Amino acid sequence: TRLHNKSFENIQVDGKRLHTAIRYGVSQAILDAVAKSSKRLMCEVVADEYGTTVSEEPIPIFTQSGDNRYDNADKMILKGAAVMPHALINNVKLKLGEKGEILKEYVQWLSQRVQKLRNDENYMPVFHIDVYGTIGAIFGVDNYPAMADYLAELEEAAKPFHLRIEGPMDA
């Protein structure tokens, strides 16, 4: 399977590799075909290829809401996503706020929403939010105290859930 995938990854048309989505789709089709032909699950094929075993425990899957962060967060909560929502916070004015207020309100809403919609009090997703350097953009990439204070505010807004912030600043 890896051999097939490596050879497919190198196919070029007009001197360019095929688009990532095409390569991904074909690799999934190959994996699915190998699994079905050998009466195994796709995860078993991957485990065999890499000399490992299939996990007995659920693996936390990272989810991504895109710009429809409110509706998609609801879907993630109802499906029990372990890591959510990514949120695509890539614009200061529209998504973060000039003082970070838009994101802070969203994190508060997210915490309240999980507590309202979850079916099990043990459901404690990790909030993972990618901010694409926008926190550094509003506070200044050298203003570590202000960024740290804001991150602490976000952490408080997320309680009782854990919060991960991806890419707080571009340096």
Regions picked out by a protein language model, each given a short descriptive name:
Residues 15, 50-51, 70:
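Generic structural signal for short, flexible, solvent-exposed coil/loop and linker residues
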Residues 34-38, 42-47, 51-55:
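Extended, Lys/Arg-enriched charged tracts that mediate electrostatic binding to polyanionic substrates
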Residues 1-40:
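Metal- or metallocofactor-binding catalytic centers and their adjacent structured scaffolds
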Residues 31, 43-45, 135, 146-147:
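Broad hydrophobic/π-residue packing in well-ordered secondary structure
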Residues 56-171:
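Metal-dependent enolase-superfamily TIM-barrel catalytic cores that perform enediolate-based chemistry
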Residues 28-29, 42-48, 65-68:
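Short alpha-helical segments and helix-capping/turn motifs at coil-helix boundaries
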Residues 1, 20, 52-53, 63, ...:
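Residue-identity detector for threonine
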